[in-house]
């Protein structure tokens, strides 16, 4: 019987793999044909929830989902192979509040869980090993996690650059450079952490790929109208962008 409950990882994978070869894919107008492939991008849900489930950003729904539920690399790779069988070429790894905390260590104990490079590498290389894969892009990154754990984050960044298609973006949710907004909304990334993370991504990701685009760049998110905001907030945001530009760092958007 149906009830209001959180799905398990096993249920999630069962339905996702069934959907990979369903009419939602095979009858999609953007799928195209074998001779003339269309632009369809198949988005995979990698995990749900956020590692900040105990005290996450006040405006966000993700912490309400509780402890993150991760799907295994093998389950996701199987789903994407089924999608390839149905004619899909392009894939985006979605549903991730932070690419760097996929199967991270210390999620229950730490404010900044430690990134685990092995599972995400297994997933990305497993997907890229299929010659049918065209474009591969990913989802968000938490700059504070990257800044607090530079060594494992650098290893993950190298893997992303090796396996993703050029033009890939890691969305960084700074939301605001204003300390008052930061405190009022329980944000966990400050401008110094942000710049540290941007430097790391630029170190490896600003090289250009075969299509002429930088391999991997940060995308910077701001939110207007948050608690604690003032006219000065916008000047702080602008000053931060000027600092990033003066340092010669690249952003995708």
Segments (PLM) and residue ranges:
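Acidic, low-complexity intrinsically disordered segments
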Residues: 1-71
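Active-site mouth loops of central-metabolism enzymes
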Residues: 69-70, 227, 231-232
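Short cysteine/histidine-rich metal-coordination sites, predominantly Zn2+-binding motifs
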Residues: 71-81
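Auxiliary Fe-S-binding modules of radical SAM enzymes
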Residues: 1, 205-207, 213, 235-238, ...
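Conserved SAM/AdoMet-binding glycine-rich loop
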Residues: 81-229
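Conserved, mostly hydrophobic/aromatic
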Residues: 50, 76, 172
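Basic, glycine-/proline-tolerant helical and adjacent loop/strand elements
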Residues: 32-34, 66-73, 101-114
């Amino acid at each position: 019987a149906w009830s209001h409950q959180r799905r398990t990882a096993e249920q999630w994978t069962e339905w996702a793999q069934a959907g990979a070869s369903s009419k939602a894919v095979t009858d999609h107008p953007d799928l195209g044909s074998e001779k003339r492939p269309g632009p369809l991008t198949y988005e995979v849900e990698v995990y749900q929830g956020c590692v900040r489930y105990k005290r996450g950003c006040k405006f966000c729904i993700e912490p309400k989902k509780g402890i993150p539920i991760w799907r295994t690399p093998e389950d996701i790779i199987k789903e994407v192979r089924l999608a390839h069988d149905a004619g899909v070429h392009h894939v985006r790894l979605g549903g991730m509040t932070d690419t760097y905390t996929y199967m991270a260590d210390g999620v229950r104990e730490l404010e900044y869980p430690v990134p685990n490079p092995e599972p995400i590498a297994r997933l990305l290389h497993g997907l890229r090993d299929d010659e049918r894969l065209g474009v591969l892009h990913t989802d968000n990154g938490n700059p504070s996690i990257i800044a607090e754990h530079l060594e494992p984050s650098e290893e993950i960044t190298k893997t992303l650059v090796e396996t993703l298609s050029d033009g890939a973006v890691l969305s960084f949710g700074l939301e605001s450079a204003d300390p008052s907004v930061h405190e009022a909304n329980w944000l966990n990334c400050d401008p110094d952490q942000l710049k540290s993370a941007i430097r790391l991504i630029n170190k490896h990701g600003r090289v250009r790929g075969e299509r002429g685009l930088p391999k991997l760049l940060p995308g910077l998110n701001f939110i207007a109208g948050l608690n604690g905001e003032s006219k000065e907030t916008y000047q702080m945001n602008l000053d931060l962008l000027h600092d990033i530009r003066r340092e010669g760092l690249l952003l995708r958007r």
